[in-house]
Swiss-Prot record:
Listed InterPro entries: PyrdxlP-dep_Trfase, PyrdxlP-dep_Trfase_major, PyrdxlP-dep_Trfase_small, Ser_HO-MeTrfase, Ser_HO-MeTrfase-like, Ser_HO-MeTrfase_PLP_BS, SHMT-like_dom
Quaternary structure (record): Homodimer.
Protein name: Serine hydroxymethyltransferase
Localization, UniProt: Cytoplasm
Classification lineage: Bacteria, Bacillati, Bacillota, Bacilli, Lactobacillales
Organism, scientific name: Streptococcus pyogenes serotype M3 (strain ATCC BAA-595 / MGAS315)
Pathway assigned in UniProt: One-carbon metabolism; tetrahydrofolate interconversion; Amino-acid biosynthesis; glycine biosynthesis; glycine from L-serine: step 1/1
Residue numbers of N6-(pyridoxal phosphate)lysine PTMs: 230
């Protein structure tokens, strides 16, 4: 019987080897990809539970299948915890991803072809904020706003003037590579001025918002979307919040049956665990440590004139660095750092001159190293190791030194092998 095959290692050695190799990679590499984090064993246990067997189209108390009394409890726990965590009146926890959450929000707020003002991808926005290769840019008429050419920060007066000119039905705030706090109150004022809805995509900063160390968009946005991983440190999935009951009904209809069929109740259970973890007072200390570590790491780059820190600093979990004075492009930097077991990603910088396949910059985030227990001292050390590797990118002896120092750090802060 299939139920006898409960051990992946014995049943599927080929797959197990790949999983084990990934576990070893995470254990012994320094993870600086800003959209990644390390979940608890409790989150993983919930996601790997028997809930994966249950189909449950619909919502708690209103399902299209029988036998849903247990998953109703699970999903209701996730909903109520999300509402409490973010101070929202309504929450939908069924979206499979942040992109699905954004798609549902658009469906709830606007029609195909409507004009939307969103952050340009090159300035730090996201694919789902109007990229022409994404469903958002193909379905709606997106106009991109950028950052100020001198400060590399959002210029709210300029965004207001742009909104007046294009008269959008919706304004999208939020980013995937913007290192500064976003003034959601100003965005709402801009939206109100032109009669537009405001949607905030807080996927990257959700954990910081939950902990109260970053301004919350919930009091200002008509709809807030998010992922449940990244700084929130939950499973990979989506979340939608609103304080408007009429919009909540539209959101629910957009998610199901509009975009999705049955929800992933095992993932929703893992979301519930993550929300409970984030409601613990210790999570605020964790979120503040992310900000402290990121600022400390960024400061090392700011003090080295061979690198340029985009916008001059960071207020959150992420920052961008122009590396072109020491190496040809961000892609080469990413690949080189992979070789010394430091994982991050190439990233376009504002007013980028290179191809998006190469880029001038790299993006660095500190959520994952903070989850391992690393602090300011280790963050500064990691920054120096990155600089050491990039500056000496053709010196194998020095690169080997960096590898050894990385291994010492990861051994000192084990992930799951405690």
């Amino acid at each position: 019987m299939i139920f006898d095959k409960g051990n992946v290692e014995d049943f599927d050695k080929e797959l197990w080897d790949a999983i084990h190799a990934e576990e070893e990679r995470q254990e012994h590499h320094i993870e600086l990809i800003a959209s990644e984090n390390m979940v608890s064993k409790a989150v993983m246990a919930a996601q790997g539970s028997v809930l994966t067997n249950k189909y449950a189209e619909g919502y708690p108390g209103n399902r299209y299948y029988g036998g849903t009394e247990c998953v109703d409890i699970v999903e209701t726990l996730a909903i109520e915890r999300a509402k409490k965590l973010f101070g929202a009146a309504f929450a939908n926890v069924q979206a499979h991803s942040g992109s699905q959450a954004n798609a549902a929000a658009y469906m709830a707020l606007i029609e195909a072809g409507d004009t939307v003002l969103g952050m340009d991808l090159a300035a730090g926005g996201h694919l789902t904020h109007g990229s022409p290769v994404n469903f958002s840019g193909k379905t709606y008429h997106f106009v991109g706003y950028s950052v100020d050419a001198d400060t590399e920060m959002l210029n709210y007066e300029a965004i207001l003037e742009q909104a007046k000119a294009v008269q959008p039905k919706l304004i999208v705030a939020g980013a995937s590579a913007y290192s500064r706090n976003i003034d959601f109150e100003k965005f709402r004022a801009i939206a109100d001025h032109v009669g537009a809805y405001l949607m905030v995509d807080m996927a990257h900063i959700a954990g910081l918002v939950a902990a109260g160390v970053h301004p919350s968009p919930v009091p200002y946005a008509h709809i807030v979307t998010s992922t449940t991983h990244k700084t929130l440190r939950g499973p990979r999935g989506g979340l939608i919040l609103t304080n408007d009951e009429a919009l909540a009904k539209k959101i629910n209809s957009a998610v199901f049956p509009g975009l999705q069929g049955g929800p992933l109740e095992h993932v929703i259970a893992a979301k519930a665990v993550a929300f409970k973890e984030a409601l613990d007072p210790a999570f605020k200390d964790y979120a503040q440590a992310i900000i402290d570590n990121t600022a400390a790491m960024a400061a090392v780059f700011a003090q080295d004139d061979r690198f340029r820190l985009i916008s001059g600093g960071t207020d959150n979990h992420v920052f961008l660095v122009d590396v072109t004075k020491v190496i040809a492009n961000g892609k080469l930097a990413q690949n080189l750092l992979d070789e010394v077991n430091i994982t991050l990603n190439k990233n376009a910088i504002p007013f980028e001159t290179l191809s998006p396949f190469n880029t001038s910059g790299i993006r660095i985030g500190c959520a994952a190293i903070t989850s391992r227990g690393m602090g300011v001292k280790e963050s500064q050390t990691i920054a120096r190791l990155i600089i050491k590797a990039l500056v000496n990118h053709d010196q194998e002896t020095i690169l080997e030194e960096v590898r050894q120092e990385v291994r010492q750090l990861t051994d000192a802060f084990p992930l799951y092998k405690k």
